[in-house]
Amino acid sequence: LCSRDRLIKGQTAFTKWSDVLTKIELAYGVERNVLLAIWGIETSYGTTRGEISILSALATLAFDGRRRQFFEAELSAAIEILHKSARFSSQFKGSWAGAMGHVQFMPSTYLNHAVDFDGDGIADIWSDSPIDALASAASYLSHHGWIPSLPWGSVVELPRHFDYALTAPNIRKTVSEWVDIGLKALPENGDAMGSLILPMGATGPAFWISDNFDALKRYNNSNSYALSVGLLSNAFTTNEYCHLQWPTNIKALSKTDMKTLQTQLTEQGFDTKGSDGIFGPNTELAIRAFQKRNAMIEDGFPSLGLLERLRKNQQ
């Protein structure tokens, strides 16, 4: 998501919409680089907004049944939008999941957070102009805890012999406290609170993340998404491609393997609170407890090696 091509196109968009982004930043306190990154990742700066009928997409998903209540509510919200403004009927298109416009709002998000920033009397996130859409994204982040001028996070360098138990999600420290532990490349705000994450375990990059990272996850509840937005936003500042050395020898667990891992952990006394094949906080805590019990690096990462270790324990 954070590619060289997206950076170059974003720089062009930055120049074109610079004055608007400045005004939005002043109004909502959300940095222009972050808004530009969201726009770039969601729709490649408005070039891929989706061509599927929103009503058809939501009706299909509601009928499918896996998240019926959620999509029925979104379908109701979509109908409400059209009831309020029939002018959107010809533009009412988006993704297969029902997300709409330059910044891919769901209908309920539009009703709650869309704003008319250009002053034409209507919050239009579908038009060729991204002004209302970018302001609406800023409005959303502002309402979900975005703190002005606080860095979302940074790539950090861990000291030798680092205690990976400190990367548990419930451990938060100030920047100054992390520096005292030996971390490098942290933001300059010594009082800022944050925690550490290891998206690929102990062998991959480490990140310090702040409350603004959590605000980005309210937009899309995925560490990968929030990291992509954050890294791309940084790239607009440095004008450098956001390239990191990710491990190439680590294969992500399939959903079936994840279910097996969760089942094995629970059977061995480390309750994951269910085996749904989705890696979440309960599974991470169970993994960390297993790793601690077995004198392993406590990075909470669901690797194939961990799954094999669990299987051997059952033999």
Functional labels for PLM-detected ranges:
Residues 53-62, 100-116, 137:
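Substrate-binding/active-site groove segments that recognize
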Residues 47, 60-64, 77-81, 164-315:
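Cell-envelope/ECM-targeting effectors and their regulatory/trafficking segments
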Residues 3-41, 51-52, 56, 60-73, ...:
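Export/targeting segments at the very N-terminus of extracytoplasmic proteins
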Residues 44, 84, 102-115, 143, ...:
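Glycine-rich, acidic and aromatic/proline-enriched surface loops and short helix-turn segments
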Residues 43-53, 64-68, 84-90, 104, ...:
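Secretory-pathway/luminal and periplasmic proteins that interact with or process carbohydrate-rich
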Residues 117-125, 277, 300:
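Acidic, glycine-anchored loop motifs typical of Ca2+
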Residues 65-104, 109:
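Phosphate/pyrophosphate-binding betaalpha-module
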Residues 123-177:
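Ligand-binding pocket segment of bilobal, Venus flytrap-like solute-binding proteins
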